[in-house]
Amino acid sequence: MTMICTAAWVHGQVQGVGFRYATQHQAKLQGLSGYVRNQDDGSVEVVACGESAKVEKLLDWLRQGG
């Protein structure tokens, strides 16, 4: 089992719509640690740490629009 940490920035209509909460929920379902926070430019920063397959699953979820 390989443990990794990764960062992603999500752009678009992601502030004020519950996106951070939904992302945190998905990360918790995968047993990941990290954080999700709003950025001044309107994007959201996501840092996720855990088993590589579970981090990749979260990234796939983000790529599909959350």
Swiss-Prot record:
Catalytic reactions on record: an acyl phosphate + H2O = a carboxylate + phosphate + H(+)
Gene Ontology molecular function, alphabetical: acylphosphatase activity
PROSITE patterns (UniProt xref): ACYLPHOSPHATASE_1, ACYLPHOSPHATASE_2, ACYLPHOSPHATASE_3
Catalytic residues (positions): R20, N38
SUPFAM superfamilies with a match to the protein in the record: Acylphosphatase/BLUF domain-like
Leader sequence residues: none
UniProtKB keywords: Hydrolase
Acylphosphatase-like domain: residues covered: 5-66
Enzyme Commission number, as recorded: 3.6.1.7
InterPro entries: Acylphosphatase (IPR020456), Acylphosphatase-like_dom (IPR001792), Acylphosphatase-like_dom_sf (IPR036046), Acylphosphatase_CS (IPR017968)
Keyword Hydrolase: yes
Family: Belongs to the acylphosphatase family.
Protein name stated in the entry: Acylphosphatase
Species whose genome carries this gene: Sodalis glossinidius (strain morsitans)
